[in-house]
From Swiss-Prot:
Binds 1 [2Fe-2S] cluster. Keywords: 2Fe-2S, Electron transport, Iron, Iron-sulfur, Metal-binding, Transport. Homodimer in solution. It holds the Pfam family 2Fe-2S_thioredx. The gene is fdx4. This is Ferredoxin, 2Fe-2S. GO terms for molecular function: 2 iron, 2 sulfur cluster binding; metal ion binding. Ferredoxins are iron-sulfur proteins that transfer electrons in a wide variety of metabolic reactions. [2Fe-2S] cluster binds at residues 10, 23, 56, 60. Its cofactor is [2Fe-2S] cluster. The keyword Metal-binding applies.
Length: 111
């Protein structure tokens, strides 16, 4: 059986023109929906993976942000078309998608 994964997708929204912007304004709701569709149609992943929408994870300028636990891999600027690659390479294959990784093991820009 595959290792359990918990995927967090920031869907934080802010008012238009806010200087920090938000993941939602950069398309994170579509990213979340793409993960849900992919996971719910794959029997193996459906039993081993949870997808959770979250509020701000303080990496707004790199959004949409996705974090995979227990691996602690942070992805940035994720687009809906990146979801298949993250699912196949990381969730199923155990290898992060390096071109999208912004941090491993801790929130980006901290410590």
């Amino acid at each position: 059986m595959a290792e359990f994964k918990h995927v967090f997708v920031c869907v934080q929204d802010r008012p238009p023109g806010h200087p920090q912007g938000s993941c939602a304004q950069r398309g994170s709701r579509e990213v979340f929906q793409a993960f849900m569709e992919k996971i719910q149609t794959d029997p193996q992943l459906f039993m081993t993976t949870v997808i959770t929408p979250t509020g701000c994870m303080n990496a707004c300028m790199m959004g949409p942000v996705v974090v995979v636990y227990p691996d602690g891999v942070w992805y940035g600027q994720v687009k809906p078309e990146d979801v298949d690659e993250i699912v196949e390479k990381h969730l199923k294959g155990g290898e992060p998608v390096e071109r999208l990784v912004i941090s491993k093991g801790k929130p980006p820009g901290m410590f």
